[in-house]
Swiss-Prot record:
It comes from the Eukaryota. One of the primary rRNA binding proteins, it binds directly to 16S rRNA where it nucleates assembly of the head domain of the 30S subunit. GO terms for molecular function: rRNA binding; structural constituent of ribosome. It comes from Staurastrum punctulatum (Green alga). Gene3D superfamilies: Ribosomal protein S7 domain. One of its GO terms (cellular component) is chloroplast. GO terms for biological process: translation. InterPro entries: Ribosomal_uS7 (IPR000235), Ribosomal_uS7_bac/org-type (IPR005717), Ribosomal_uS7_CS (IPR020606), Ribosomal_uS7_dom (IPR023798), Ribosomal_uS7_dom_sf (IPR036823). This is Small ribosomal subunit protein uS7c. Belongs to the universal ribosomal protein uS7 family.
Length: 155
């Protein structure tokens, strides 16, 4: 048995405006070069756009988008006998949520358009409607795991 202690993991504090940990997680991943105020502005503008376009609570739209993009399984590369296998592994909920947020932001950054806030708001709305590049990425990951199910015993 290992003598090493397990990592407790940090508690993320809730966002001051929305009082939500998920929003704070989004802000921290949007963050570039330590400019947190810029990240907050981007997210708050995106939330306003979502509110105006959908006439729904923007927090509910964000939650739904992240829930729909969160993957259940992923593939990990494992070397065995000189060849590399893509082995499907289950993902913990927190890890899946972090992946979902990263995929949504990557898809938003790739979008053509004006500001990052505008692109992020549209990507979140698309993800909530189960369209968009982030959803495509999740489906692609699930397809990859399904295709490599035969290698599941290599964990």
């Amino acid at each position: 048995m290992s003598r090493r202690s397990t990592n407790e993991g940090r508690l993320t504090r809730p966002n001051p405006v929305y009082r939500n940990r998920l929003v704070n997680m989004l802000v921290n991943i949007i963050l570039k070069n330590g400019k947190k105020s810029v990240a907050y502005r981007i997210l708050h503008e995106a939330m306003k756009t979502i509110q105006q376009k959908t006439k729904k609570n923007p927090l509910a739209v964000v939650r739904q988008a992240i829930r729909r993009v969160t993957p259940n399984v992923a593939v990990k590369a494992r070397r065995r006998g000189g060849s590399t296998y893509q082995v499907p592994v289950e993902i913990k909920p927190d890890q899946g949520k972090a992946l979902a947020v990263r995929w949504i932001l990557a898809a938003a950054r790739k979008r053509p358009g004006r500001s990052m806030a505008f692109k992020l708001s549209y990507e979140l709305m698309d993800a909530a409607r189960q369209t968009g590049n982030a959803i495509r990425k999740r489906e692609e990951t699930h397809r990859m795991a399904e295709a490599n199910k035969a290698f599941a015993h290599y964990r």
